[in-house]
Amino acid sequence: MALDLEKLKFGTELIKRGFSSMTKGGVIMDVTTAEQAKIAEKAGAVAVMALERVPADIRAAGGVARMADPKKIREILDAVTIPVMAKVRIGHISEAYTLEKLGVDMLDESEVLTPADPFFHLYKKKLTVPVVSGARNLPEAVRRIFEGAAMVRTKGEAGTGNIIEAVRHIRKVNEEIAIVRRMTQDEIKTAAENIASSYFQLRNEASTDLFGQSGKVLYDDVYYGMSREKIVKGISDILRQIRKLNRLPVVNFAAGGVATPADGALMMELGADGVFVGSGIFKSPDPEKMAKSIVEAVENYKDYDVVARVSEGLQGMPGIDIESIPRDSRLQERGW
């Protein structure tokens, strides 16, 4: 039977997840100029992430961080042949559609930018372009997959050059997957109800505003036309997929604090499918050498002779101790 290409259109879950899987085992690099994008491509990056400023500069500047200038994104798109991704603010529907129209290959609904919606992330199934989202734990990852994320990544603590939070997040996801493997059907439903609860925050607040604490709350249309029951069922289905696969049903990359070849190798050793590098390359003294070295270390993460060789003579970006950052100033705290 001939394949009906008309039915296999860009934008289906199959295509979006398939595109994301093509980046497995590789390194995706943050770039702010066309020249940096060329350096990343030459170094062997599987994709680049176009943004206005790298996370370290966003952290230092403070204020409100938004999507990059479309002109800059077009310049980067024209400069390289590898896929180009772009960051969008959490929940910013209009930024997402604008970036999709520009022709980027993938979006990152990113906590590095200032969130736009205090209640909801993007409903990514409405976009034709695949979306990656950050997660500190399995409940966050499951919510993003339920919304249509084609890829998940650790949040880490972007712009610090400190790998500890990325390690924390991937270890938590791995541990929680191990727990899901042993869950009964009743336990899966209970977990799904707990994971789904963040979708009801707006309805709960609105009902309290109108009726006070004693008012009855209806959960018939709480997120893009979906009822509480439909959301819980969708999340239960994802948990059952995880139990069957013993992993997330989408690729899971490491991000947030990768600053050396050994950092990249460590995240692969812990089970990441690939690595995002933000500030770690272009905030290092020798970006070209650092870019090539991280790519080689990630591709050969079990060969420590290679990791040692590519690390020689390298100096990473200045780092920040996580404990010196107030909790409410940590980028990883953004998102729900």
Curated annotation (Swiss-Prot):
Pfam families linked to this entry: SOR_SNZ, ThiG
GO terms assigned for molecular function: pyridoxal 5'-phosphate synthase (glutamine hydrolysing) activity
Binding of D-ribose 5-phosphate, residues: 30, 159, 257, 278-279
EC number: 4.3.3.6
Pathway this chain belongs to: Cofactor biosynthesis; pyridoxal 5'-phosphate biosynthesis
Biological-process GO terms, alphabetical: amino acid metabolic process; pyridoxal phosphate biosynthetic process; pyridoxine biosynthetic process
Residues of the active site: 87 (schiff-base intermediate with d-ribose 5-phosphate)
Superkingdom of origin: Archaea
Reaction(s) the record says it catalyses: aldehydo-D-ribose 5-phosphate + D-glyceraldehyde 3-phosphate + L-glutamine = pyridoxal 5'-phosphate + L-glutamate + phosphate + 3 H2O + H(+)
TM regions (residue ranges): none
Signal sequence bounds: none
Family: Belongs to the PdxS/SNZ family.
NCBIfam families named in the record: PRK04180.1, pyridoxal 5'-phosphate synthase lyase subunit PdxS
Subunit structure: In the presence of PdxT, forms a dodecamer of heterodimers.
Function: Catalyzes the formation of pyridoxal 5'-phosphate from ribose 5-phosphate (RBP), glyceraldehyde 3-phosphate (G3P) and ammonia. The ammonia is provided by the PdxT subunit. Can also use ribulose 5-phosphate and dihydroxyacetone phosphate as substrates, resulting from enzyme-catalyzed isomerization of RBP and G3P, respectively.
Protein name (database record): Pyridoxal 5'-phosphate synthase subunit PdxS
Organism the protein comes from: Thermoplasma volcanium (strain ATCC 51530 / DSM 4299 / JCM 9571 / NBRC 15438 / GSS1)
